[in-house]
């Protein structure tokens, strides 16, 4: 059974539910303090929260911690690396994913359920979805406005949409270019996404649509 490290920085607050989602998806998971090593694990998740209270920029300080050197090695070795919300911000700050997360177009914290369109199923985290599938997850962020100079040169995995899959301005909660909600590296083993799949991993929570992210990751790590 693949083992996953869920990295905990000062200010991380989505670690317990992320561990639970991985276990429900068939993997083993442990919370790992950022000063410890993750080398013995098969994959790594950087969960949501407010690492270092978002000082300087969201994710900026966490991205410069020593543990990120091991995360970089994971990425280069082809092992799965998932960044959720603040974790996505950390991955862009560390240069492991292209682009940047800027303050929301309307400068306030946004917490609500949204629809996503699955744009790329050829990644370690989306192989169990159908291309074009519409899924539902919550978001909770103040700096989720994704920007990249040339969107045509990146792998867009998730896009904000309406319930019918239309990529409208109204469906875009934060002003992200091309309604982008999640991107991967060229190899497809590193994914950053602003929506919270761990909060959509049980019907009791309102949706199980996010569970496939973790199930896909577990299946990928078995290879």
From Swiss-Prot:
All residue ranges annotated as the Glutamine amidotransferase type-1 domain in the record: 4-223
An annotated GO cellular component: cytoplasm
The keyword Ligase appears for this protein: yes
GO terms of biological process kind: 'de novo' IMP biosynthetic process
Gene3D superfamilies for this protein: 3.40.50.880
Superkingdom classification of source: Archaea
Single annotated GO MF: glutaminase activity
One Pfam family in the UniProt entry: GATase_5
Pathway named in the protein's UniProt entry: Purine metabolism; IMP biosynthesis via de novo pathway; 5-amino-1-(5-phospho-D-ribosyl)imidazole from N(2)-formyl-N(1)-(5-phospho-D-ribosyl)glycinamide: step 1/2
Catalytic activity of the protein: N(2)-formyl-N(1)-(5-phospho-beta-D-ribosyl)glycinamide + L-glutamine + ATP + H2O = 2-formamido-N(1)-(5-O-phospho-beta-D-ribosyl)acetamidine + L-glutamate + ADP + phosphate + H(+); L-glutamine + H2O = L-glutamate + NH4(+)
Entry keyword set: ATP-binding, Cytoplasm, Glutamine amidotransferase, Hydrolase, Ligase, Nucleotide-binding, Purine biosynthesis
SUPFAM superfamilies: Class I glutamine amidotransferase-like
Active site location: 85 (nucleophile), 196, 198
Compartmental location: Cytoplasm
Subunit: Part of the FGAM synthase complex composed of 1 PurL, 1 PurQ and 2 PurS subunits.
Job description of the protein: Part of the phosphoribosylformylglycinamidine synthase complex involved in the purines biosynthetic pathway. Catalyzes the ATP-dependent conversion of formylglycinamide ribonucleotide (FGAR) and glutamine to yield formylglycinamidine ribonucleotide (FGAM) and glutamate. The FGAM synthase complex is composed of three subunits. PurQ produces an ammonia molecule by converting glutamine to glutamate. PurL transfers the ammonia molecule to FGAR to form FGAM in an ATP-dependent manner.
UniProt-recorded name of the protein: Phosphoribosylformylglycinamidine synthase subunit PurQ
Protein species of origin: Pyrococcus abyssi (strain GE5 / Orsay)
Source species taxonomy: Archaea, Methanobacteriati, Methanobacteriota, Thermococci, Thermococcales
């Amino acid at each position: 059974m693949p083992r996953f490290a869920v990295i905990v920085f000062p200010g991380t607050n989505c670690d317990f539910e992320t561990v639970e989602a991985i276990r429900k998806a068939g993997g083993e998971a442990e919370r790992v303090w950022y000063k410890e090593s993750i080398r013995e694990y098969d994959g790594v998740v950087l969960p949501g929260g407010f690492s270092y209270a978002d000082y300087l920029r969201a994710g900026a300080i966490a991205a410069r911690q020593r543990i990120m050197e091991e995360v970089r090695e994971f990425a280069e070795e082809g092992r799965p690396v998932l960044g959720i919300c603040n974790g996505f911000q950390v991955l862009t700050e560390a240069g492991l994913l292209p682009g940047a997360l800027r303050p929301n177009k309307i400068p306030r914290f946004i917490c609500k359920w949204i629809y996503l369109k699955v744009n790329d199923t050829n990644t370690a985290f989306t192989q169990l979805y159908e291309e074009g599938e519409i899924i539902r997850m919550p978001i909770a962020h103040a700096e989720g406005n994704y920007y990249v100079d040339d969107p045509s040169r990146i792998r867009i995995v998730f896009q904000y949409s309406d319930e019918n899959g239309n990529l409208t301005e109204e469906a875009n909660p934060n002003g992200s270019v091309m309604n982008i909600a999640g991107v991967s590296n060229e190899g497809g083993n590193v994914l950053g996404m602003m929506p919270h799949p761990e909060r959509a991993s049980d019907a009791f929570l309102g949706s199980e649509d996010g569970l496939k992210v973790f199930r896909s990751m577990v299946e990928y790590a078995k290879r």
